[in-house]
Amino acid sequence: MDARVATLADLDVVAETIQLAFADDPVWSRAFAHPDDRGVAAFWRLWLEGALRYPWVWMTQAGEAVSVWIPPGGDELSPEQEAAFKRLAESSLGRRGASYLDAVMACFTEAHPHGEPHYYLSLLGTHPAHRGHGLGMALLAENLTRIDAEGAAAYLESSNSANDQRYQRLGFALHGRFNLPDDGPIVTTMWRPGRGPEPSPIRRP
């Protein structure tokens, strides 16, 4: 997998991939149901700007697939970005939509484990034009190799049950489930314990 760390210079490409990848997602298509495309793009750009504070947003060379990680001890948004996110929600979604989005985010926060330090996979998406070639899972597998080298654990939320088995094949196990408000979809949380790097083969004289 030819992957690299994304920077702010890649924001346009990364944001387009994530926005299109999650356009039909059971959770986020409902949470962002009212804004036009420009409004939805503003949400994703702000979210990604928060993640790009860390060197853990990964992309294939042309941005066909993107993974967004928050490293141990990190936050998805700075306090200033959180305030901007709330203002954007109110202006784009209206009071009722902003209230729903706030309730959705509260569900994610409540379910998130806060014991053992871990890498948090906030987003993983493949551009629709490049789906079906395993790029997203290959990028995730590459990232996990780096996380394993640190002996760190990893956590994610699966907003689409069709992906659960794919995550399980990479070592994630069921951690829990929660329902979103107003009879919203079920989100599955998954945990991958820390592992050491693969041992080097023993060379015999």
Regions from the language model: what does each represent?
Residues 2-16, 20:
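A short beta-loop-alpha structural element at the N-terminal edge
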Residues 126, 132-145, 169:
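Conserved acetyl-CoA-binding loop-helix of GNAT-fold acetyltransferases
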Residues 34-56:
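Active-site rim helix/loop that mediates acceptor-substrate recognition in acyltransferases
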Residues 152, 156-161, 180-205:
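C-terminal "cap" of GNAT-fold acetyltransferases
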Residues 137, 149-151, 160-177, 183-184:
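Conserved active-site alpha-helix within GNAT-family acetyltransferase domains
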Residues 49-69:
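Conserved beta-hairpin
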Residues 117-119, 146-159:
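Conserved GNAT acetyl-CoA-binding A-motif
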Residues 66-125, 131, 181-182:
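Conserved acyl-donor/pantetheine-binding loop and adjacent beta-alpha core of acyl/acetyltransferases
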